[in-house]
Every structure is written in structure tokens, then in C-alpha cells.
């Protein structure tokens, strides 16, 4: 069964976050020789399939998995949930259609195409040495993500089944398949700053303290400011204001306060603590309150790591393209793997139609991606 056939079947399930719609039963049917773990909460479902190939004859699989001699454990990871399709599609978003070399359907790029490719590669993998292959899937990546991959990894830690390496099949490529590998991601800090003033009548400014005037004096040091210089793989961390609110909507009353909502996408050089210190310095002697919350931490996998090297080699061999290693974009479930010390990268199809009307993936991409993933498995098992 090839990547196209599997992807078509996956698209046919209307798995809008966090609905699973029975898709895991189909996936489990493809892997009768794999062991299964499932967990979930609040309507979220997660599936983990795993198999030890070529275990020593004098060890049961479960016992062998817990010993110091356990083989390399590699995991393919992804999500089967999709965002709502909306209206104005040329065809039913959950009835896959092939047209002019493309497969159309919600999730074709994000990320049922990637999942279909690694499921097919896993089915065709037949190593000659001991190797533990696993597949981790969740129905909650597009949503809050609280009970998705993060929860499953916690369960795997309890069972001593955490992988050594993982590829998350996010749609990472920009123009051609193979042009981009995500070897890390920026962190995200959300903040709320309230500058306080004294409300009053605009005709008596001497009796007021307008917090908007206060904001104007420090705005150049807050809005769009770079918090560090970045490095080879990370852009400079930047503070971005996303919302401002002040006043009652009347034209003759100065506001009592102004609320500034902001976000900082940041590299390893900036932390919540360093951002707090910076803002405290900028706002020194001003009346304010500040709230900061880190929603995700930055991470990076070494550019010379075994996983990165094997993936690069197979991309060059199959796609005839040298991938750019980068950390651009938003957050992904790869951060949950990194938090457990797992060597993780992201690689998948082109992302030009993700979350869009008439989402589609090239048939050639699916074919090549399956070959890349199979090559990675073979390369790691032979190392």
C-alpha cells in the first residue's frame, strides 16, 4: 500500500480537532504486528504503535525493551486532526480528489500527506538488525495540544518507551520538496502590560494622568524591539504588540489605564526572566502591572546530529536538493519531544496550501517523501 492510497483514506475521515472519527482503527489495521498503546482525555485520542525488529532470541520483546541493550528507538510522529475546511471548496474537502497531478482534500498538506508517507515507509521497512520503530499520532495538534502528544509522551516515559530520535512530518518545505528541515523552533512568551493613570476630564489635563502619554514615551523601546541578535539558526527574538486597549469610548474622558497585549517569539538567548528584566528596566518608576506566560520553550537539534545527517543525505539522494536547516515558523509538537531530551527534527511536504481552501499535495511529493522516510529508516538501522 503506497503513500497516495493511505493518504486518500486518511483524508476521508473528517477529523476536525479533536475528533478522531475512527481513523485509528484503520491505521491499526495496517500494522497487525505492532503493539498498541492508546490514551487521551477531554475528547482527545492518541495512538502509539511500536515494534522491535529482530530482538535477541532469548528475550521477550517487553523484557528486551527495558534493558540497557535495547536497540535504537526511532519514532515517526504527527497529527491526524485538521482545521475546519470552511466553504467555497471546488470539491468536498473530505472526499479526496486527484486532479492534474495533485491530491485535493483537507489535511492533504497539514499533515495527512506526511502521515501517509511515513505509514507507507513503515510498512515497507524490513531491517536486518535490532531496531525499534514506533508511530505516535494525536487528534489534538491544531487545538490546545494539552492532551495530545505531550500526554502520550508522559505515558511513554512511565513505561520506559521514549524514543531516542523522532521525525515530525510537519509540512516544512517552501517551494520544492526537500528545501527545508526544521531542526528547532522558537519559544513563545505571551504578555499583558497595564500602564496606570488617573482618569479625568479632557478639559482639565492638569488633573489627569493620561497613560497613553506614558505609553508613547516608552513605545519605541517595546514595540517591535529585538531582544537579542539571534544566531545562525534563530532570527532575533522580537517583542510584538498584538492588541491595545484604553478608555471608555467617550471623547471627553481620559483613560484610567492602557492595556498592552504582546507576544515574543524568542531564541535560546532570550528567556521569560530576561524579558521581565528588560521590561522592568524600561518601565522603571512608572505605575504598571506585568504578566508574562511562556507557552512554549525554544529548542534546537544539532545540525551535525546523526538524525539530521541521515535525513539530509536521503533528501539529497531522493530529491536532488540540499535542505536549508532552520527554525522559522510557529510552534509544533516537536517541542514536546525535545523537552524529554529526544533528538527531533521536522520534515514534510510543501506548505503553500496549509489551512487554505482547496488544500492539495503533489502526487510526486508523496512518492518522494515516502522514499526519503524509508531511506532514513534504512540509514539509521544500518548505522
Curated annotation (Swiss-Prot):
Cofactor binding description: Binds 2 Zn(2+) or Co(2+) ions per subunit.
Domain of life: Bacteria
Record-listed Zn(2+) 1 binding positions: 79, 110, 170
Disulfide bonds: none
Binding site for Zn(2+) 2: 110, 142, 355
EC number: 3.5.1.18
Enzyme active site: 81, 141
Record-level Gene Ontology MF annotations: acetylornithine deacetylase activity; metal ion binding; succinyl-diaminopimelate desuccinylase activity
Keyword list, A-Z: Amino-acid biosynthesis, Cobalt, Diaminopimelate biosynthesis, Hydrolase, Lysine biosynthesis, Metal-binding, Zinc
Cofactor (UniProt): Zn(2+); Co(2+)
GO biological process: diaminopimelate biosynthetic process; L-arginine biosynthetic process; lysine biosynthetic process via diaminopimelate
Catalytic activity of the protein: N-succinyl-(2S,6S)-2,6-diaminopimelate + H2O = (2S,6S)-2,6-diaminopimelate + succinate
Pfam family, one: Peptidase_M20
Family: Belongs to the peptidase M20A family. DapE subfamily.
Functional note: Catalyzes the hydrolysis of N-succinyl-L,L-diaminopimelic acid (SDAP), forming succinate and LL-2,6-diaminopimelate (DAP), an intermediate involved in the bacterial biosynthesis of lysine and meso-diaminopimelic acid, an essential component of bacterial cell walls.
Description of how the protein assembles with itself and partners: Homodimer.
PANTHER family the UniProt entry points to: ACETYLORNITHINE DEACETYLASE, N-ACETYL-L-CITRULLINE DEACETYLASE
Protein's name according to its UniProt entry: Succinyl-diaminopimelate desuccinylase
Amino acid at each position: 500500500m503506497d503513500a497516495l492510497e493511505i493518504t486518500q483514506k486518511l483524508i476521508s475521515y473528517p477529523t476536525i480537532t479533536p475528533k478522531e472519527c475512527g481513523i485509528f482503527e484503520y491505521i491499526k489495521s495496517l500494522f497487525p504486528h505492532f503493539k498498541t498503546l492508546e490514551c487521551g482525555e477531554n475528547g482527545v485520542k492518541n495512538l502509539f504503535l511500536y515494534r522491535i525488529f529482530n530482538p535477541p532470541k532469548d528475550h521477550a520483546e517487553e523484557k528486551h525493551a527495558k534493558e540497557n541493550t535495547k536497540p535504537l528507538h526511532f519514532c515517526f510522529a504527527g497529527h491526524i486532526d485538521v482545521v475546519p475546511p470552511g466553504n467555497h471548496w471546488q470539491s468536498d474537502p473530505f472526499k479526496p480528489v486527484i486532479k492534474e497531478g495533485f491530491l485535493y482534500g483537507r489535511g492533504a498538506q497539514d499533515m495527512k500527506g506526511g502521515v501517509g508517507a511515513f505509514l507507507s515507509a513503515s510498512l515497507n521497512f524490513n531491517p536486518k538488525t535490532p531496531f525499534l520503530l514506533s508511530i505516535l499520532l494525536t487528534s489534538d495538534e491544531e487545538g490546545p495540544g494539552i492532551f495530545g502528544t505531550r500526554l502520550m509522551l508522559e505515558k511513554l516515559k512511565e513505561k520506559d518507551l521514549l524514543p531516542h530520535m523522532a521525525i515530525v512530518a510537519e509540512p516544512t518545505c517552501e517551494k520544492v520538496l526537500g528545501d527545508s528541515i526544521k531542526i528547532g523552533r522558537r519559544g513563545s512568551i505571551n504578555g499583558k502590560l497595564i500602564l496606570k493613570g488617573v482618569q479625568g476630564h479632557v478639559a482639565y489635563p492638569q488633573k489627569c494622568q493620561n497613560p497613553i502619554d506614558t505609553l508613547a514615551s516608552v513605545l519605541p523601546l517595546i514595540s517591535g524591539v529585538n531582544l537579542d541578535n539571534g544566531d545562525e539558526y534563530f532570527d532575533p527574538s522580537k517583542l510584538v504588540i498584538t492588541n491595545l486597549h484604553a478608555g471608555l469610548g467617550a471623547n471627553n474622558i481620559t483613560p484610567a489605564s492602557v492595556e498592552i497585549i504582546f507576544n515574543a517569539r524568542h531564541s535560546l538567548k532570550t528567556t521569560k526572566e530576561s524579558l521581565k528584566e528588560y521590561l522592568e528596566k524600561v518601565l522603571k518608576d512608572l505605575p504598571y502591572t506585568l504578566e508574562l506566560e511562556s507557552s512554549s520553550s525554544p529548542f534546537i537539534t544539532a545540525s551535525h546530529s546523526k538524525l539530521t545527517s541521515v535525513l539530509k543525505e536521503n533528501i539529497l539522494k531522493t530529491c536532488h536538493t540540499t535542505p536549508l536547516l532552520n527554525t522559522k515558523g510557529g510552534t509544533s509538537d516537536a517541542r514536546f519531544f525535545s523537552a524529554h531530551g529526544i533528538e527531533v527534527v521536522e520534515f514534510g511536504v510543501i506548505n503553500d496550501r496549509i489551512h487554505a481552501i482547496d488544500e492539495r499535495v503533489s502526487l510526486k511529493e508523496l512518492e518522494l517523501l515516502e522514499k526519503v522516510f524509508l531511506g532514513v529508516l534504512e540509514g539509521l538501522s544500518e548505522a
